Curated annotation (Swiss-Prot):
Residues 200-209 have a biased composition (Acidic residues). The modification Phosphoserine is found at S334. GO terms for cellular component: cytosol; nucleus. InterPro entries: TF_CRF1/IFH1. It comes from the Eukaryota. The lineage of its organism: Eukaryota, Fungi, Dikarya, Ascomycota, Taphrinomycotina. Keywords: Phosphoprotein. This is Uncharacterized protein C22H10.11c.
Length: 629
């Protein structure tokens, strides 16, 4: 395999030498084997500048496939008769190579030789270079000639610069005074020279702008590998539209982008994020209500818990403070009753901000003594109540527990179950569990029971019970509870008399309990969603397929028709084209029963008497024909 890096571009081997026939015989004498064990190491840009080595003159063999054990170095002889400016013959370690016989310019006493492992580079003295260049900045002023080069791998920046420079050789034409007038390009192929005159600055700009396409591809491949190994240092592409939507919902971007003043945040009613869906502008400027509400707010990470002070009935008694509530025996008998009461009773500091009662100190002291002696509370609770200073006890009112409230084991909700959590209970209305409304709830609020026996006064169910009731779900004003006597009468008559107490349940429409989650499009039928023409075409196509299969006609999976059947089918098609509107639909049933017809004439593209109906809808007129129209 001939290595194109070793091309030799010689303009005039000897002064006055013009015999080109003998020059063409030179390549046969220059083929010699190369030992790869003594190949040089990679030469980079810094080392190349130190050694003053020439660059490669071809870009397609920078990554050459050195598969052969022996390699022959060839060269090419240029046809230009003009002497190249800077000629630097090379020498090998194994002398002689018969290259010195071409030129004797290296015999200068001041020339120096530099060995790179394979070749010896002999450079002429600097006076020779300065005299030849004559102040013109050229590539050949600081680099060697393209005589015989070893395979090298250069850095990428050098490859960019040299890829275009190696395409051509620049040789000046000098006038009598020794100054160059114009420059000629002599290519490898030896084409005719095209002369043009440019300045050195324009030449440098052209050389920097023109980059070889092959090196651009290699650079793209290298950059792709660079990015794959360093993904963590590269920022991902972010779609600004999607990011702005997400930031708006998360509350990071205001809905009014023109508002940039953040000094008056309390006065700004402009909401951000999900607050737009829960707009309560009346409470925006009320800072006290926000502080009170922030204590009970929950985030996405924590689950909402039932506060302890909600277990108490906070409605003050209408009678005198001396009356004591009737607490169930289950509270005192249960082992956890003391701990539950201690945690459930609110502290005076919590209640002082909400309640402001201005009474005498004597009445407050007597109220504390009465609650200590007669309620049956533990001594620790009494001490905790009396241990507060007088200034804090002033704003504290007495609260009484609900006698029907069982803290240890709460009742199940009306329409669901309690989901047991490690810290609290959650009521779930699942529609599967239900409890008797009469025995559980309505026995406690019979007529006259609250006013006669209890010392409270009339109270509703929501005030006396903490579990959710029907009033929390829907309006139960028309739902009248039935008493125990009514139930006993119904059982004795064996349900002869119909109970109309729960007749309201029959009138509850579907979707009452999931009104906000109800999608209207789910209740529509597919025929209403689709277009009328689309639905009609589907029904007609299904009907036609059913009739074709019933009559035993040929289908696509059957054996192909014979020539006789094909001729008959073509005749039927021609006949169908000539048929009038009335004839075609009157003979439609007989045409389907014909054994030679497969109904293919319906697939032809023709309109039926200007009605705009396609062939698929033509079987619809069979109904009109059978009904007598």
């Amino acid at each position: 395999m001939a290595l194109t890096n070793g091309r030799i571009e010689e303009y005039d081997i000897q002064n006055g030498y013009q015999n080109t026939e003998e020059i063409k015989k030179l390549p046969a004498e220059l083929n010699f084997p190369v030992d790869f064990d003594k190949m040089p190491t990679f030469i980079f840009q810094e080392e190349r500048q130190k050694l003053d080595l020439p660059l490669s003159d071809s870009e397609e063999n920078q990554f050459h496939d050195f598969s052969d054990s022996k390699l022959s170095l060839g060269f090419e002889i240029g046809r230009s008769k003009e002497k190249f400016v800077d000629e630097k013959p090379f020498y090998s370690n194994k002398e002689p190579l018969k290259i010195n016989s071409w030129k004797k310019s290296s015999s200068h006493p001041k020339s120096k030789e530099v060995s790179n492992g394979l070749l010896k580079v002999s450079t002429p003295p600097t006076e020779f270079v300065k005299r030849e260049n004559a102040g013109i900045r050229r590539r050949s002023s600081n680099q060697g000639s393209f005589a015989l080069e070893a395979p090298k791998i250069l850095k990428r920046d050098a490859m960019f610069k040299e890829s275009w420079k190696n395409k051509c050789f620049i040789s000046p034409q000098k006038d009598n005074q020794g100054f160059s007038k114009s420059k000629h390009l002599s290519t490898y192929e030896g084409e005719t020279e095209n002369g043009f005159s440019t300045s050195t600055e324009e030449e440098e700009e052209e050389e920097e702008d023109i980059v070889s396409a092959s090196w651009v591809d290699n650079l793209d491949m290298d950059m792709a590998s660079f990015n794959s190994h360093r993904e963590r240092f590269l920022t991902e592409h972010v779609n600004m539209d999607e990011r702005s939507d997400d930031d708006f919902l998360l509350g990071l971007i205001s809905s009014d982008s023109s508002v940039d003043d953040h000094d008056n945040e309390q006065d700004d009613v402009d909401l951000i994020g999900w607050e737009c869906f829960f707009d309560d502008s009346s409470d925006e400027l009320n800072t006290l209500s926000h502080q009170a509400d922030d204590e009970g707010d929950t985030t996405d990470e924590e689950t909402p818990e039932l506060q302890n002070n909600k277990l108490l009935n906070l409605s003050t008694p209408k009678k005198s403070f001396g009356q004591t509530p009737r607490i169930k025996t289950e509270l005192s008998e249960s082992p956890n009753s003391q701990r539950t009461l201690l945690s459930a009773v609110p502290t005076p500091l919590e209640l002082s901000a909400e309640l402001a009662y201005k009474e005498d100190l004597t009445s407050l002291a007597s109220r504390a003594n009465i609650s200590d002696n007669s309620t049956g509370l533990t001594p620790t609770l009494a001490k905790a109540t009396l241990a507060q200073p007088v200034s804090t006890v002033v704003s504290v009112a007495s609260f009484e527990l609900d006698p029907r409230l069982n803290i240890t084991q709460p009742k199940p909700p009306v329409m669901g179950t309690w989901a047991k959590e490690p810290n609290h209970l959650i009521g779930i209305i699942d529609g599967k569990h239900s409890h008797s409304l009469h025995h559980d709830k309505f026995d406690a609020c019979t007529k006259g029971e609250n006013t006669a026996n209890n010392g409270y006064g009339p109270q509703t169910l929501n005030e006396t019970s903490e579990e959710p009731s029907l009033d929390d779900i829907l309006d139960t004003s028309l739902l009248q509870p039935s008493t125990q006597t009514d139930l006993q009468e119904e059982n004795s008559v064996s349900f002869a008399q119909e109970d109309n107490s729960l007749s309201r349940w029959e009138k509850i429409p579907i979707g009452t309990f999931r009104k906000n989650q109800y999608i209207k499009s789910m209740a529509r039928r597919d025929e209403l969603i689709r277009d009328e023409w689309f639905t009609l075409a589907i029904k007609t196509r299904e009907k036609r397929r059913h009739k074709i299969n019933a009559t035993g006609m040929t289908t696509t999976n059957s054996v192909p028709l014979r020539p006789k059947s094909r001729k008959a089918r073509r005749a039927l098609k021609k006949k169908a084209r000539k048929m009038t509107f009335r004839q075609m639909h009157s003979d439609f049933q007989s045409a389907l029963e014909d054994e030679h017809n497969d109904g293919s004439y319906l697939d032809n593209d023709y309109e039926t008497v200007g009605l705009g109906l396609g062939p698929e809808l033509s079987p619809l007129f069979e109904i009109l024909e059978s009904s007598g129209y």
